[in-house]
């Protein structure tokens, strides 16, 4: 099997019977200390899609005539991910305020739809932050972000979410609207500062 990394031939020891996953691990070890990670795999000229990756990695490497690995700089990947997360968070602010307006207009069904979108965005952004920190080998609790105490901010976020849950459970839409409009602005601004800090690296 011919192995390439970023279009350059790669001399690598692949014992008979090695799986594509084992070969990928060897290539990943070669990249240690370079600030790069594998971001795509092509087998016989075909890029392996994400939904086929697990199955393909389990197959013997010898089934393919050529295996090409593409790598990218970690810094660039994290920067792009954090910038996109920041855009999503701005959208969540818009949805949050719109949901509050709808609650005040007694349009609770539509408001709940928008609130659900907010929760999905927050969850997505949270996962993005965790993965970005992992790629950069950063301890989030030790991150030095100007004007942001990360530990206190996480506690504040948890408190606000508990308050929203409580308002939802008792059906207090007036309280829920006030929480969405006024009590998440500080949390949101600190989210954005953290995302900007991780993007700048």
Each language-model region and where it sits:
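C-terminal-biased regions
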Residues: 2-201
